[in-house]
Design a protein with these regions (language model features):
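C-terminal output helix
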Residues: 50, 143-152
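Acidic, metal-coordinating helix/loop segments flanking the phosphotransfer/catalytic sites
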Residues: 71-88
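Conserved phosphotransfer microenvironments
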Residues: 87-108
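Alpha4 helix (beta4-alpha4-beta5 surface) of REC/receiver domains from two-component response regulators
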Residues: 122-138
């Protein structure tokens, strides 16, 4: 049986009303080691929902199930990344007041062994900014579920295989 706890109980986020994933498996449960934790950041709940729905709970049959942690603020992203346990972060490049591209660059510069980061952008022409942001991959809105799941799976496979997340 899976033990459940709130995100706040895991010590990642203060209970300040941000919509995070309502519950996540407890660290002590054996199923946690098999799950992949994906942090999804956007100030807009509908963008977070679009990202999680496009990826689905299992982006590929050869990968473990995905457990999403949704956050709406930069402080929440920083707290989660500092706490560890995040296998992949997906950041909204259009988030306000701090966008995912600048946040990606900050995380890559400041965190040793930073987990892979995917940046979601609104315009295909903005993909070049991912190079500056040091993102490992880019998703373009509107999200195609096949492309989104494949991109996430490719990044996770590279990191699980001991290869750099960027191809």
């Amino acid at each position: 049986m899976l033990a459940w706890g709130t995100v706040a109980e895991r010590g990642w986020f203060p209970p300040d009303g941000h919509r995070c994933a309502d519950t996540v498996p407890s660290v002590s449960s054996p199923e946690v080691s098999a799950a992949t934790t994906v942090l999804v950041f956007s100030h807009r709940p509908e963008v977070r929902e679009a990202i999680t729905m496009a990826i689905g709970r299992r982006p590929a049959p050869d990968l473990p199930r995905v457990r999403f942690v949704e956050v709406g603020g930069v402080a929440d992203v920083l707290a989660a990344m500092d706490a560890g346990g995040v296998d992949l972060a997906i950041l909204d490049g259009e988030a306000q007041p701090t966008g995912g591209m600048g946040l990606s660059r900050q995380l890559k510069d400041e965190i040793t062994d930073c987990p892979p980061i995917i940046v979601a952008v609104r315009r295909r022409d903005d993909r070049w900014l991912a190079t500056w942001s040091q993102a490992d991959a880019v998703l373009v809105h509107p999200l195609d579920p096949l492309t989104a799941a494949e991109t996430v799976a490719d990044v996770l496979r590279r990191t699980r295989g001991g290869l750099p997340a960027r191809g």
